[in-house]
Amino acid sequence: MTVQAIAGVSPSSEAVVMTEYPSIAAGGIAQLLGSIYESIPSPAGLPKLSYLFALATAPFGILLYALQKLFGQRYVLTNRAIQGWTARTSRMVSSLNLSDFDRVEVVQSAGQVFYNAADLRFVGANGETLLRLKGVKDAGAFRNAIERTAESRRMVQESLATISARG
């Protein structure tokens, strides 16, 4: 059994905090469908007619979902980085350390509104985009998890530096 000075903190290993699979709103075809769904007006007091149109195009949505699961990505938040992995294989396609970005922005295009999804844009200190996670379902919650994990990482690093400075 390993004793940790700070519960849940391991200075030598990386641990998964959260895994997020993007919605079909990550792709252009689904965003086009989402834009069409949102453009259908809803009569006052009645359910949105766009739900009926979405039901009619459901087989196409299922195909897009299957393709996303086969050939898309998954986003993994660890105690050290945010990573993009291929959905089926264990191949990392992108990574950004939690200390390397300045802020995380939620960018929602018109086609993503119907799916309650958005892109997460990681911005560096100089304003450049360091990483973009496309089509994240409930992006605000995932952004909060990333920001809290990054803040925790920073505080842990400060604590470990203070402890090691004591000698």
Predicted regions mapped to residue ranges:
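N-terminal basic, Ser/Thr-rich segments that initiate or prime the first beta/alpha elements at protein or domain
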Residues: 1-167
